[in-house]
Amino acid sequence: GEAFTAVTEHFAQFVRPSTSIAGIEARGFIFASALANRMKTGFVPIRKAGKLPHAVFSQNYGLEYGTDILEIHVDAIPFAGEVLLIDDVLATGGTLDAAIKLVNRAGGSVYQIVALLEIQALEGRARLAAKYPQIPVHSLVVS
């Protein structure tokens, strides 16, 4: 609907030419795939362990209640490719940190993080800024 279109158009301002757009499972896929289609560029899925069909890089990350694993195809990103990383929620920053590491291992570099919602009290933005000061973070809604 109109809200989805407005979000996608807002996120489009962060896309550079020849950029790949990576989305983190599952709701990050919704915005990242739509934006990649709109901008006529590649979509890179970053998924939970065991869901991608061939050779992958894996990365453990912490959750409030334990740990999990994200994966990316080893050939998902053109060599030295720039990546716009999209997720639905920025909370502690753990998932996005793991995704950045995966993009780096796949030969790319994240130049921007975009989230639909940021939960400010969980300080994910501060953690990411301390670890990756060169990567700006944009959140559409901050609560």
Regions found by a protein language model. Give the residues of each.
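PRPP-associated nucleotide enzymes
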Residues: 1-86, 90-143
